[in-house]
Amino acid sequence: MSLDIAKYPTLALAENPDELRSLPKESLPKLCDELRQYLLDSVSRSSGHFASGLGTVELTVALHYVYQTPFDHLVWDVGHQAYPHKILTGRRDKIATIRQKNGLHPFPWRAESEYDVLSVGHSSTSISAGLGMAVAAAREGKNRRTVCVIGDGAITAGMAFEAMNHAGDIDPDMLVVLNDNEMSISENVGALNNHLAQLLSGKLYSTLREGGKKVLSGLPPIKELVKRTEEHLKGMVVPGTLFEELGFNYIGPVDGHDVQGLVATLKNMRDLKGPQLLHIMTKKGRGYAPAEKDPISFHAVPKFDPASGTLPKSAGGLPTYSKVFGDWLCETAAKDSSLMAITPAMREGSGMVQFSRDYPQQYFDVAIAEQHAVTFAAGLAIGGYKPVVAIYSTFLQRAYDQLIHDVAIQKLPVMFAIDRGGIVGADGQTHQGAFDLSFMRCIPTMVIMTPSDENECRQMLYTGYHYNEGPSAVRYPRGNGTGAPLEPLNSLPIGKGVVRREGEKLAILNFGTLLPEAAQVAETLNATLVDMRFVKPLDEQLILELAASHDALVTLEENAIMGGAGSGVNELLMARRRVVPVLNIGLPDFFVSQGSQEEVRSDLGLDAAGIQRQIEVWLAQ
């Protein structure tokens, strides 16, 4: 489903950056208008990340206009904002396939285009990678430039500051563009500041600045005085003292929606020596009023009617697991003021909006800082509170050392509510929750629970919250529950599974929300079905009894087979010298690509038909 490019005559002339750079500078505002409209028309018909891209149209055009991409390296952080980049780099006609099975990748992806020099999806990686590229480019000696684009949210993460601190030390030739969309374009970001930015980025000022530093460095008695005076004077016009202290030459803030001004500033900055930081001010959702008004709702959108300006409401029906968690949080906080809920910038996605409003003193959004979130929770636990860390499976990977060193070793009662466990779908390889059971299962003192429905999820949240012997985790998927009735909250017996169906010869040991599919297969094959509930500790007694009374066992989980729950069953049986055939069904040993959850599960044989087929093929061997 491609759009009629004739409706976008200037954009039609810029199929790739080479064509873009052949356009006269005067045509760039018109190009930006058409690019923004093309983005609106395509995403509204197909779904995808939306508001961020609207805010980076002018920046994207200016960067490709000034820099010789793909020879020069352009690195996008996270990648939500890179749809205009994809449109301008030969992928315009495929943009409607983004995030779909066999379509364009949702983020910049090295295997997709030579213009995507770094595959991304998680935040705050761009400056570290860009620094490495800049060092490599310097040794190459071909005058290749490196530009990193990072947002005001992503730059708050520790990794970004670690990279800037290193860059300030080794002094590479690179540019970091800080895309700041937290503030609107106000009076202090107008003609004066744009003129100032072009002046400060010019060769004359740069030469005087560097020459002055060399002269002043030879005058010890006045060096510090001059340094402080320079900082004071510069602080009056630009808010860049922090970046200057890290060793960057700071330029800005400038209007990120003035494409011709950006081109002029970037041309000045391209040949500057040392690490540079350009601070631009943009508006998320720029050019589409509903997205400007509510950029959070329009961050990632389903298909919608742009004329109405409203997003389709969900059909209601079954609650999501995220909502089940959020409701449990509110219910628990109403009775227990010691509950402290923590999220690393995922309030909406984790179902915590209502909690944050009703219990603001018990709610902490620590920004994109997963490592800090976990150790902060450890401190709260030491202080006698009951911390709950709400975090996506894929982002918990970023805090693994803190989970071990700061929580588990000290046996602190921190509960992890792990959302998006298993297949998440359209965001692809970087966001699938494929590894959490594997990387948590090897940690001593951890209790790991995998609910099979929303009622089980509530009971496990209650169980983990009241477990005081160490850390616990409840791991649940993206999507809706099953409609299971919600029972009064009670603690489950730790490490005990439940037999859901008695069968013969074959026993299926289920971990998590594939239980309905497993139930269909068990009925067809007359197999015993067990909801194991706990990945750790395993119900060893039940497993050994099943091994003794059945000819074969099947483990089922939506996690990597390697190191997962099924591996734990294998280890137990081998340790006890129980020789029984075991089939482990789960995620294979490759990074799972994008597609709807249903498509991915079908492709991997994790729907009912696929599970049955895998079992029958295995039994026939």
Curated annotation (Swiss-Prot):
Annotated pathway: Metabolic intermediate biosynthesis; 1-deoxy-D-xylulose 5-phosphate biosynthesis; 1-deoxy-D-xylulose 5-phosphate from D-glyceraldehyde 3-phosphate and pyruvate: step 1/1
Reactions this protein catalyses: D-glyceraldehyde 3-phosphate + pyruvate + H(+) = 1-deoxy-D-xylulose 5-phosphate + CO2
Keyword Nucleus: no
A Gene Ontology cellular-component term: cytosol
Binding, Mg(2+): 152, 181
Superkingdom, natural source: Bacteria
Cofactor(s) it depends on: Mg(2+); thiamine diphosphate
Binding site for thiamine diphosphate: 80, 121-123, 153-154, 181, 288, 370
Record's keyword annotation contains Metal-binding: yes
Stored NCBIfam families: dxs, PRK05444.2-2
Free-text function comment from the UniProt entry: Catalyzes the acyloin condensation reaction between C atoms 2 and 3 of pyruvate and glyceraldehyde 3-phosphate to yield 1-deoxy-D-xylulose-5-phosphate (DXP).
Subunit structure: Homodimer.
Protein name (record): 1-deoxy-D-xylulose-5-phosphate synthase
Organism annotation: Serratia proteamaculans (strain 568)
Designated gene of the protein: dxs
